[in-house]
Amino acid sequence: GYRKAYGDPGNGDFVDLHNYGPINERNTPAPDDRRAASIGEFGGKGLFVRGHMWPVRNNSYEILVNREILSDTYVFLLNEVEQMMVYRGVSAAIYTQTTDVEHEINGLVTYDRKVEKMNFSKVKAINEAILETARKLNEKGSTLSQSRTYPQ
């Protein structure tokens, strides 16, 4: 669907919002009677990895200090997205971003694709858990249990 830079024009297939702050009911769209809800961009958490960045001043919405904090922050954000999926009806959420790009260090991997910036066991576990929750939401008469154990 179409999305203006600021605000929802009311057309397209999605009620969409880009959100780089807390993920909660106040700043997450809800579906309406004709459109699904999506968080079109979220995350924006960065990590400097010297020697693996585009050779200019790099930025991010928030710079974190190490791989484990970045990984745990990703898990926290995905748990929040899952809550909005279950209790607000969000159908899609797009993490910014999969790889570092020119000027931005928000990726899961570095610009040169040589360094994994997050603990991918944790990333995989939360991603799979959310996919399972989505599957259960689509089963008629199912109940959801959201307790889980994450890899260290």
Residue ranges and their predicted role:
Residues N19-P22, G43:
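Short, acidic/turn-prone active-site loops that include or flank metal/cofactor-
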Residues R26-Q152:
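Substrate-binding clefts and catalytic carboxylate motifs of secreted carbohydrate-active enzymes
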Residues D8, P22-P29:
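Acidic-and-aromatic substrate-binding clefts and catalytic sites of carbohydrate-active enzymes
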Residues N11-N19, R35-A37:
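Active-site regions of enzymes building and remodeling cell-envelope glycoconjugates
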Residues G1-F14:
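Active-site neighborhood of glycoside hydrolase catalytic domains
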